[in-house]
């Protein structure tokens, strides 16, 4: 999978991220309620909150997987930094952007991904995501529910 492009506003994005002062703090309990709710509401095994700096995707809360970070250049979520609101892939093997990702072809063999951009000062600083190893549908009701959760 090709790495996501660097956003044109990368410097401002990184400044907004650093202004939060939580990037290098380990997993955070305050986000766990959100990720647990997503797993239950959408019947997915994995949900997480992440922040993405210049090189690394840092996991701030995760359900269903033991992961604290991954390189930005292998991250599906890094692509979400480039959109205004969200990316939804009902089957990652059918999406040209992601079908060759190591997260799709090896290891977890993910099939479903929904990632919402998390914003600070108008900048995309991270993601609220849910994933599964099997395809799912993602309809308008799901979109509205996830939009509500992501705008906390």
Model-identified regions with their sequence ranges:
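Intrinsically disordered, low-complexity terminal regulatory regions
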Residues: 1-73
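Amphipathic alpha-helical "output/dimerization" segments
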Residues: 138-152
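Short coil/loop residues immediately preceding or within conserved phosphate-binding loops
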Residues: 44, 113, 125
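A short, aliphatic-rich beta-strand micro-motif
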Residues: 111-119
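A generic structural motif
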Residues: 134-136
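Regulatory sensory and allosteric helical modules in signal-transduction proteins
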Residues: 45-46, 52-62, 67-111
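Sensory-domain boundary capping and coupling elements
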Residues: 77, 118-132
């Amino acid at each position: 999978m090709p790495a996501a492009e660097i956003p044109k506003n990368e410097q401002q994005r990184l400044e907004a991220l650093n202004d939060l002062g939580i990037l290098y703090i380990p997993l955070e309990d305050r986000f766990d309620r959100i990720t647990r709710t997503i797993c239950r509401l959408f019947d997915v095994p994995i949900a997480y909150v992440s922040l993405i700096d210049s090189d690394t995707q840092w996991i701030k809360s995760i359900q269903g997987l033991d992961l604290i970070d991954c390189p930005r250049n292998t991250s599906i979520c890094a692509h979400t930094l480039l959109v205004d609101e969200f990316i939804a892939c009902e089957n990652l093997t059918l999406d040209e952007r992601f079908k060759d990702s190591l997260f799709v072809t090896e290891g977890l063999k993910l099939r479903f991904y929904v990632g919402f951009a998390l914003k600070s000062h108008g900048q995309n600083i991270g993601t609220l995501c849910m994933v599964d190893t099997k395809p799912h549908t993602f309809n308008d009701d799901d979109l509205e529910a996830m939009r509500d959760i992501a705008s906390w």
